[in-house]
Amino acid sequence: NPPAKEDFYTVVLRRPLRFLPGEWQRYSNLGYLLLSDIIEKVSGKPYEQFIREEVLFPAGCYDMHIAANYYEDKRENEVRYYTHEGDGKFIEEYNNSGRIVERCYGGYNIPLLAGAGAWCGSTAELARFVASIDGRPGVKDIISPESVALMTGYYDKDTFSLGWNDTHPVKGWNRT
């Protein structure tokens, strides 16, 4: 059986930090995974349900969902995923079955890691979502102007913004 999320946390949190807090930063999916668990604990709802009801629906996005682990479980309008060259196309299945699977179909427990990504939606859905959090006129934002400013503020070339890999005054935003 695959490790439980709690076991995953135990293993990851036992690893030493690469630097002291406040000295440097590094992008970490673990932070988003922890955030999804906090959302579930505080809201009393599964993460996907909470995000759909409280974030996506108010943004006008009604056809976004968390990806599944296997090709045969993908939604009708979901793309076919491919593994990047050099990433190793085949690996052992995430659930320790011993099966060798395509990395993008069974290599990871995607629903378990949902807070760190895995959201699927069309280009139109993604555009509606971004328009609802960008602070620009035309589409009502679902977050406060203060939150938009915190999320999109440019600090310096070595500092991540809140929720984005990078925000730049001229180049714009870069994905998480």
Language-model-detected regions and their locations in the chain:
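Short, surface-exposed loop or secondary-structure junction motifs
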Residues: 1-175
